């Protein structure tokens, strides 16, 4: 399980994660949390080259609860 980053913002349709390093995961990468629960999939990468932001389409549920959670690649 590779640590990808932390969710910093969330709306009902998209969450934004900040990458923990300079490695950019592939679009479509499925993300899980520390409990191995599905979080969503990466649909876009934007921002600085160092620690870019990742747009994530959530798998459902209360997306506000995702803020502050660490996410990992499945």
Named regions from a protein language model:
Residues 1-56:
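Short beta-strand/strand-turn micro-motif
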Residues 2, 55-59, 63-74:
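Beta-strand/loop-dominated core regions that host nucleotide or nucleotide-derived cofactor-binding catalytic loops
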């Amino acid at each position: 399980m590779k640590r990808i980053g932390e969710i910093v913002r969330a709306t009902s349709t998209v969450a934004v994660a900040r990458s923990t390093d300079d490695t950019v995961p592939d679009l479509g990468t499925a993300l899980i949390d520390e409990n191995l629960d599905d979080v969503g999939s990466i649909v876009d990468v934007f921002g600085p080259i160092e620690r870019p932001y990742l747009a994530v389409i959530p798998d459902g549920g209360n997306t506000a609860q995702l803020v502050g959670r660490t996410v990992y690649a499945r």
